[in-house]
């Protein structure tokens, strides 16, 4: 589902059940996993891979070419400057993994 004012650029792939919320930007060649939630005003630079069932919190930014592993949560307002593992909570500027979800 793509909400109003969201931007999805060329070559991006949004899989089944994913939500691209209001005013989010998904740049070229990003891959958004099934059932992921890209919250309002998130900016994903080019070639970002977001795993299945990931939530990227409101106003977060993800630097080009990075990956966020399946089932992870990125806190609101975070700046992701390195890959995020699967099944973790990460937040901050720069985003740091702070706890496991399993």
Regions found by a protein language model. Give the residues of each.
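Structural signal for interior beta-strand "rungs" in well-ordered beta-sheet cores
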Residues: 1-91, 95-98
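Short hydrophobic/aromatic patches at helix-to-coil boundaries
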Residues: 100-102
């Amino acid at each position: 589902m793509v909400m109003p004012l969201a931007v999805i650029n060329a070559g991006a792939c949004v899989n089944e059940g994913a939500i691209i919320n209001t005013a989010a930007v998904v740049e070229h060649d990003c891959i958004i996993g099934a059932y992921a939630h890209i919250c309002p005003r998130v900016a994903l630079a080019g070639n970002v891979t977001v795993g299945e069932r990931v939530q990227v919190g409101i106003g977060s930014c993800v630097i080009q070419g990075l990956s966020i592993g399946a089932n992870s949560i990125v806190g609101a307002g975070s700046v992701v400057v390195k890959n995020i593992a699967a099944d973790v909570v990460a937040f901050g500027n720069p985003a740091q993994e702070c706890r496991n979800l399993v």
